[in-house]
Amino acid sequence: MTRVEPRRLVAALALLNLGVLVYCLCVLTTTGQTVDQGLMVSAESLSGDLAEICAEFVELVAPVSAAGAVLVVCLIAWRGNRIALALRAGIMTLGPIATAWILKYSLDRPNLDGLVQHNSFPSGTLTCVTAVVCAVYLATARRWRIVVAINGALLIVGTAVSVVVLKWHRPSDALGALLLVGCYALAVSAFPIRISSPRHSTLADPGNERLAQV
């Protein structure tokens, strides 16, 4: 374990405060609820054929997330320092998902815009997808992280757009999910660990040099 990176902890705290601000403005105020609801309705009306694409896209979210979880397990099994890496991946995956579930059922959504609806902040679907993507990113070797980042970003953006267009969630719900996972990602990455593949660990021992050449 290397030294803690305080700047990432500060950034995580900033995202946490921003998430609280989004909730207070978009859920606890009349103007915020009205604008938030209006944006969701407008997204649906302006989407056109996009709604069908989003519906098909969302159907892929569950299997892709499951595949991502399996990939994390495989990466942990293949790389060194498995305990630390498994702990990091577990916190990165289960932490945001559990927090989103607790927040969704504990936070209040007052009836301010005339629409009696249950609280949906933050989006559990988007939280799950984003958390799995971040876990895969953290468990992947550095040289492959750009590939994970690009494909993961496309998956996250597609999911965020889909849940709003399909009226599963309001824009603030999606933003809250992203801020929540971002907070966890920064906090977890603030405690870096040294990871090497089993092969590299073997070669690092001078006594194994002859064996490695066979």
Functional labels for PLM-detected ranges:
Residues 1-65, 104-113:
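N-terminal transmembrane-helix/juxtamembrane module of multi-pass inner/ER membrane proteins
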Residues 2-5, 75-88, 138-147:
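Membrane-interface helix-boundary motifs at transmembrane edges
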Residues 8-15, 84-92, 147-151, 173-176:
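Alpha-helical transmembrane segments of integral membrane proteins
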Residues 26, 75, 100-108, 137, ...:
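Membrane-water interface at transmembrane helix exits
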Residues 58-80:
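Hydrophobic alpha-helical transmembrane segments
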Residues 72, 94-102, 131, 186:
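Transmembrane alpha-helix boundary/anchor motif
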Residues 87-119:
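Hydrophobic alpha-helical transmembrane segments of integral membrane proteins
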Residues 113-213:
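Membrane-embedded catalytic cores of phosphoryl/pyrophosphoryl-handling enzymes
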